[in-house]
Amino acid sequence: MEIHILDSETIAQNVARTLTGNYWLGDLSSSGSLIVHYVGRSDTCLHRRLKEQAAKHKWEAFSFRPTDKFCLPLKEAFDIECREYHLLKPRDNKMHPDAPSGLTNYSCRYCELEANLSSAPVDEGGVY
């Protein structure tokens, strides 16, 4: 994924107004990599959400991934946001992502996986 400077002009040039999807916010490392401090999603307009985040002047760069409009974009974006939240544990995400309002009875598969792993029996060698 490409890394962009987080400002209104860059967002306008790179993110179409019709997109939904996921985004990663953070700072640039000395090598130009994105050090992720926040993961999020937009179920309606990624362009608008990124501009709202840019206005906070908290992060210097972003990356994004549009959802596939031909699959189930709400589920896809929620699953990706949850995966990134659990894997990266970004410092600026203060709480677990909420499920989209359009999804009923749908929960984070990574929370379920962690719960199953923590309740699995461990043999004396520490192998599951």
Question: Which residues does each predicted region cover?
Answer:
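Boundary/linker segments flanking structured domains
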Residues: M1-H37, R41-Y128
